[in-house]
């Protein structure tokens, strides 16, 4: 174990503050509709131009280990806010910077850091309660579009495309952002449930023009078993033939005489049949098969449940209005599943998402939930250059997160004005002692910081705008993109409550930790190896 370097008290806090300010100063230039660009050097690629606060924060590593600790702690504010709400990272960083700078000054002047932290925590808690009181539900298309536009730095096209996507696949539907091939942004929607498995044999093709197989008003057999023996399916084929229905089969695999029998029946026109392999692998495959079973109203035929394939009857089969299968994909439309059962399944998956610690698992669970909820929308990003595409893609992803947050918890007036309205309601807040009151004043001062920075980035005078807004009431605010005052809702300047709330809570949490730091320990750096 190598030697360690240790700093104590004010010396430690000053190093923390330097790191916090270096990171925050780089990040906060991106805040607001007139936020500036930051260029990030990429070792093996062209430089990345971005206005995304969390992207800027992630790039920053400082040489001095003590200063770097401060930078990394504020980076945690940005990341935590991004994880919870998907946006608001720059706002959180600006709030944290003010809390840390003012808090460290107070501690150096002799104020008790623990009471200071209690005062800050009390203010943040009350501010969150006040935010929730003034929130307005975000359910209509216009509000959704406005939230997306604000988060995308004022691009109305992005706001509209996100709003259209939500209209098409629903509020819980999966919306993904991919790189497009043209200059224009495009929205592509896959209705119903789609999975990445196509027909087992080309002999099932019914439409030669686009090489696809289509079944309408068909019965559905789903099993997690491999079908190779014709005896397993003879009984059910006879029952379906008598009913003059078509059959769609999903199985682990179909081979040998069983596959030959299905192909011959299909070619001769005795029975319209389509067979595909089950999607996914391992445990995920079983869960996907259960999803499809619930969506189509069928029973998953599994020997684990004591059901043998050769003994099944029509009551265990599901139904769909239309199934289309190509070489690579299959889409199920109009599944005959019970709505309550589908809702229960969606709620179960939602719970699994909230409990999952893996980003990959969360993504796969969200895909499954979307397919049950009604479809998947893909926003394809268009641009002239790869650098522009990457920057635009990051902004659309931010806007999408903001929009989801708005639908979840509602909206408040944006541009930092909602925090000023809260400020007026908290001016009489009192702590248990004078040191706590000082903490309350620090947190109240921090509430002004986002508005000040937005105005500064737009070239305005922060103190004048702040005083004008403080002396007004309700929805009156400042549009930094035009330099005009007016009703923020009418001007379409709104923020999701979840984003503002998460920014406040993350900033208060990390700010309090940094203020109460008394010692810092780091490895000795080998200057020769640098």
Curated annotation (Swiss-Prot):
Q: Looking at the UniProt record for this protein, which Gene Ontology cellular component terms does it annotate, in alphabetical order?
A: cytoplasm
Instruction: Kindly list the GO molecular function terms attached to this UniProt entry.
Output: ATP binding; ATP-dependent protein folding chaperone; isomerase activity; unfolded protein binding
Q: In Gene Ontology terms, what is a biological process of this protein? A: protein refolding
Q: Quick one: which residues bind ATP?
A: 30-33, 51, 87-91, 415, 495
List the subcellular locations. Answer: Cytoplasm
Q: Which InterPro entries match?
A: Chaperonin_Cpn60_CS, Cpn60/GroEL, Cpn60/GroEL/TCP-1, GroEL-like_apical_dom_sf, GROEL-like_equatorial_sf, TCP-1-like_intermed_sf
Reaction equation(s) it catalyzes? ATP + H2O + a folded polypeptide = ADP + phosphate + an unfolded polypeptide
- Transmembrane portions of the chain: none
Q: Which Pfam families match?
A: Cpn60_TCP1
E.C. code: 5.6.1.7
Q: Write the record's keywords in alphabetical order, separated by commas.
A: ATP-binding, Chaperone, Cytoplasm, Isomerase, Nucleotide-binding
Q: Spell out the family assignment given in the record's similarity comment.
A: Belongs to the chaperonin (HSP60) family.
> What is the role of the protein in this entry?
Together with its co-chaperonin GroES, plays an essential role in assisting protein folding. The GroEL-GroES system forms a nano-cage that allows encapsulation of the non-native substrate proteins and provides a physical environment optimized to promote and accelerate protein folding.
- Name of the protein this chain belongs to: Chaperonin GroEL
The gene that this protein is the product of is groEL
């Amino acid at each position: 174990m190598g030697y360690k370097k240790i700093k104590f008290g004010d010396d430690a806090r000053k190093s923390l503050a330097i790191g916090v300010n270096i990171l925050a100063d780089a990040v906060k230039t991106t805040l607001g509709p007139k936020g500036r660009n930051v260029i990030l050097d990429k070792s093996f690629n062209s430089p990345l131009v971005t206005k995304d606060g969390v992207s800027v924060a992630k790039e920053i590593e400082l040489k001095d280990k003590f200063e770097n600790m401060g930078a990394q702690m504020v980076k945690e504010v940005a990341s935590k806010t991004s994880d919870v709400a998907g946006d608001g990272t720059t706002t959180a960083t600006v709030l944290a910077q003010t809390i840390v700078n003012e808090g460290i000054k107070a501690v150096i002047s002799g104020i008790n850091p623990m009471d200071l932290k209690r005062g800050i925590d009390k203010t943040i808690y009350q501010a969150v309660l006040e935010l929730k009181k003034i929130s307005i539900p975000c359910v209509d298309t216009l509000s959704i579009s406005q939230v997306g536009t604000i988060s995308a730095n004022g691009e109305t096209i992005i706001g509209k495309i996100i709003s259209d996507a939500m209209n098409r696949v629903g509020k819980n539907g999966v919306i993904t952002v991919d790189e497009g091939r043209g200059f224009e942004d495009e929205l592509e929607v896959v209705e119903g449930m789609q999975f990445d498995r196509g027909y087992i044999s080309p002999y099932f093709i019914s439409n030669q023009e686009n090489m696809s197989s289509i079944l309408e008003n068909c019965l559905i057999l789903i099993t997690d078993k491999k079908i190779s023996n014709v005896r397993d399916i003879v009984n059910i084929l006879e029952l379906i033939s008598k009913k003059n229905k078509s059959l769609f089969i999903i199985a682990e695999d179909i081979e040998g005489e069983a596959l030959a029998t299905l192909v011959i029946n299909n070619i001769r026109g005795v029975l319209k049949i389509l067979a595909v392999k089950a999607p996914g692998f391992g445990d995920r495959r079983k869960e996907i098969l259960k999803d499809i079973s619930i969506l189509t109203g069928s029973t998953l035929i599994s020997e684990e449940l004591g059901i043998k394939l050769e003994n099944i009857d029509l009551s265990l089969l599901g139904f769909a209005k239309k199934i289309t299968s190509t070489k690579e994909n299959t889409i199920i439309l109009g599944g005959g599943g019970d709505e309550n059962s589908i809702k229960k399944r969606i709620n179960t998956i939602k719970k699994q998402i909230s409990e999952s610690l893996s980003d990959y698992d969360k993504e796969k669970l969200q895909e499954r939930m979307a397919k049950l909820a009604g479809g998947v929308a893909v926003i394809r990003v268009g641009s002239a250059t790869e650098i522009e595409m990457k920057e635009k893609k990051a902004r659309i992803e931010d806007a999408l997160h903001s929009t989801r947050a708005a639908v979840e918890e509602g909206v408040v007036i944006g541009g930092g004005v909602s925090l000023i309205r809260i400020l007026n309601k908290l001016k009489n807040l009192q702590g248990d002692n004078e040191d706590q009151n000082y903490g309350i004043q620090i947190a109240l001062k921090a509430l002004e910081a986002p508005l000040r920075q937005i105005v500064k980035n737009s070239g305005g005078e922060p103190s004048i705008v702040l005083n004008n807004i403080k002396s007004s009431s309700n929805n009156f605010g400042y549009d930094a993109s035009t330099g005009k005052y007016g009703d923020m809702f009418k001007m379409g300047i709104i923020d999701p409550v979840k984003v503002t709330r998460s920014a406040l809570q993350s900033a208060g949490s990390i700010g309090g930790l940094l203020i109460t730091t008394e010692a810092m320990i780091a490895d000795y750096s080998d200057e020769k190896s640098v």
